[in-house]
């Protein structure tokens, strides 16, 4: 019972599937289509799905009933998953900024034990991704769709240090040595 309360939150369901995927309902919206006889109501759902090991995706589904909209959104999220390299399996390799429409998010790597410091829809993305330590700031639009898409834009630009070293044409060990001196200088 205490476990259920801890993972709760307004409008956010967490469900683990038998295939190891975790999905979270980020936002549900009631929409209306005006027809000759009046209004025809439907629902739109935004769902984030991840394996908590570095793969995450989001999906949007629309239907006349809520469960059907959630099912469609979940299927859409599973089709469009991305892989995000994590440092020590818990945080980002480097700070990054993402944009989508009027939404802007800033994601920063954090020390172990920091936790997920993020608001609203971004928290759902990080929890399903399997990230444990991150500091995120949302600027601009607070629309959940824009926030999720901006977060994914930022996560897609995340690079593993080996890829950075290859792009710069230097050895990975040289890059790690530079990073070690930079971290020592900060402390």
From Swiss-Prot:
Transmembrane segments: none annotated. It comes from the Bacteria. The keyword RNA-binding applies. InterPro entries: Ribosomal_Su5_D2-typ_SF (IPR020568), Ribosomal_uS5 (IPR000851), Ribosomal_uS5_bac-type (IPR005712), Ribosomal_uS5_C (IPR005324), Ribosomal_uS5_N (IPR013810), Ribosomal_uS5_N_CS (IPR018192), Ribsml_uS5_D2-typ_fold_subgr (IPR014721). GO terms for cellular component: small ribosomal subunit. PROSITE patterns: RIBOSOMAL_S5 (PS00585), S5_DSRBD (PS50881). PANTHER family: MITOCHONDRIAL RIBOSOMAL PROTEIN S5. With S4 and S12 plays an important role in translational accuracy. Located at the back of the 30S subunit body where it stabilizes the conformation of the head with respect to the body. This is Small ribosomal subunit protein uS5. The lineage of its organism: Bacteria, Pseudomonadati, Pseudomonadota, Alphaproteobacteria, Hyphomicrobiales.
């Amino acid at each position: 019972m205490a476990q259920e309360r801890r993972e709760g939150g307004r409008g956010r369901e967490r469900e683990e599937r038998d295939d190891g995927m975790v999905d979270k309902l980020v936002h549900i919206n009631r929409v209306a289509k005006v027809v000759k006889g009046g209004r025809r109501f439907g629902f739109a759902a935004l769902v984030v799905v991840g394996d908590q090991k570095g793969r995450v995706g989001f999906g949007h589904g629309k239907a006349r009933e809520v469960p059907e909209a959630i099912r469609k959104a979940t299927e859409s999220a599973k089709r469009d998953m991305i892989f995000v390299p994590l440092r020590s399996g818990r945080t980002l390799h480097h700070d990054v900024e993402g944009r989508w429409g009027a939404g802007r998010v800033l994601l920063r790597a954090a020390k172990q034990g920091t936790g997920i410091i993020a608001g609203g829809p971004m928290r759902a993305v990080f929890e399903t991704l399997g990230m444990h330590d991150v500091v995120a700031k949302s600027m601009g639009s607070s629309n959940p769709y824009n926030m999720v898409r901006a977060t994914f834009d930022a996560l897609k630009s995340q690079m593993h240090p080996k890829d950075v070293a290859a792009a710069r044409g230097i050895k990975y060990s040289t890059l790690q040595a530079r990073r070690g001196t930079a971290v020592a200088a900060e402390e």
